[in-house]
Structures are given as C-alpha cells and as structure tokens.
Amino acid sequence: MGRKPPVVHGAVLIDKPAGMTSHDVVAQLRKRFGERRIGHAGTLDPDATGVLVIGVGNATRLLRFASASNKTYEVEIVFGPETDTLDSSGQVVAEHHMSVDLEQVSAAAASLTGEIEQVPPMVSARRVGGRRLYEIAREGREVDRESRSVTVSRFEVEATEDPLIWRAKVTCSAGTYIRTLGADLGSALGGGAHIRNLRRIRSGHYSVEETGTIDEAPLLPILELTRGMDP
C-alpha cells in the first residue's frame, strides 16, 4: 500500500517563544494537527523569539521560497563581554573595557552593511565534515569554518541608558547570523560583544503582527506561502 496522503495542508505563522528550538515548535504542531509533514522556514536560535513560518502537509514544498527571503530582527548588543556562543546563553570567555558613542557605533555598523563575509559561529547547525558545528563545540573543540557572503541591507543602532548596551534593527539576507554580526561589531570597535533578546519581526512578507501562539495560530491556506511571488 502507498503512503497515506496528508489531509491537513496550509501555513501557520508562529511567534516562537524563548526557550524552544524551531524543531520543538514543529514537534508540538505535529501533535496539534496530527500530521507528520510539517517544516519551518529559517531556523531561530532557542533563546530568540519572533516570526517562524511553518508549512503543513503539501505546503512544505513551498517553504524553500520563504526560507530564501530577507529577515528583519531587533536585538540588543552588549559591548565588553565575549561569550562562547556569541549570545547571552554562553559562558564569558573574554572581557574588554570599552567606551563607545553613537558616531563610533554607527560608523562600525555601516562598515558591516552591504555584502559582507561571515564566519558561522561554532554553536550553529552548519555542517563541517558531515557534522553539525554545535556537536563539535560540545566536545570542546573548534574547527576552521569557511566564510560565506551575506547581505545586510539595514543595520541601525541606538543607545540605551546603559552605555554598553545598544539596540539594533537589522534587515539581512537568509543565512545571516545576527550573533556573528554583533560579535563583529564589537571587534570593529576594538573590543568584543555578544547579543541578547533577539527577535525576528519580519520574515519575507510575514510580520510578527500576523503571528500567533503554537496552540492558537490558525491554519492558513497554502497560497499564503506564495505571498509576494511573481505571478
């Protein structure tokens, strides 16, 4: 007998909560809809929140288009401490005494705008030699990683009451690591940095205002995943 075809098809726009992997979200939605064929477009780090585009049933075939879309994030960048994960979930591995102002931070952000080269962080799902980088990192090892070209079309910064914590809004191509961008900004200013409170507010044509919770977000028509495509 052939495999039973899925009976649930569509798109779901989730506001991913902190503390869950993108796969955790998929697992919960599989239980909710009783459907195995569920996938997501664009992985979010466990501590990150925001837009996660989900395809259910036959809609999974269209996820590659959503995955390739630009993303927009809001994030806080903490200057001074470097961590092994490049975000606040990691262990501090270096401390830098830094003093920065708006002109300096804006200029450094501008230098990281446009087409740039990024080296994937060790704690990431990228594969090297057939293994996930985070698996290698868990063994306490670091390996060489090839840089890749990404495009940052917007990198806006603003100060907060804390002179070493800055807010940023970033619009970038798929595959851009915001953790790496924050660390590179710290390096460009002669020190170090890590990020916290990362939130994806837009994924392609889908905004965070359209999202819902894992339990309550509605199943949308498959055609939602063709939004913005050329006719």
State each model region's role.
Residues 1-231:
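Catalytic/RNA-binding core of pseudouridine synthases
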